Amino acid sequence: VPSRLTQEEANDVTLYAISLVGTPYRFGGNTPESGFDCSGLIGHVYKTRARVAAPRTVAALIDWGQPVPAPSLRAGDLVVFTQKGVTNHAGIYVGEGRFVHAPSSGGMVRLDALKSKYWSQQGVSYLRP
């Protein structure tokens, strides 16, 4: 599946996303200083590390990239969650079955496993920007 990102940019996106773990959650936030919501985190990381502008809402992310089958998932891809047909959350895949995201619960940017009890029960799509 083609990508807007070079391999180096995908690596930069991944490392930078991991470095933001612990940044506070803030609805509408899109900078490390203000805090992040999930789409704000994605937009900030892709803009600063790959010079690619991501949509500002999580609902718009579903149309932003190319669908990727789970076995082809690679670091820098997007993980997009859907509940009852509504796209409601997203994060950045960082490899080894893990993703970085800004959930409203927990109050900060976190690194979580896709196979965790909660996330494995959510509808998920994988996208390559």
Predicted regions mapped to residue ranges:
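Compositionally biased, proline/threonine/alanine/serine-rich low-complexity intrinsically disordered stretches
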Residues: 1-19
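ATP/adenylate-binding site constellation spanning eukaryotic-like Ser/Thr protein kinases
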Residues: 18, 22, 96
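Catalytic cysteine-centered active-site loop
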Residues: 1-4, 23-75
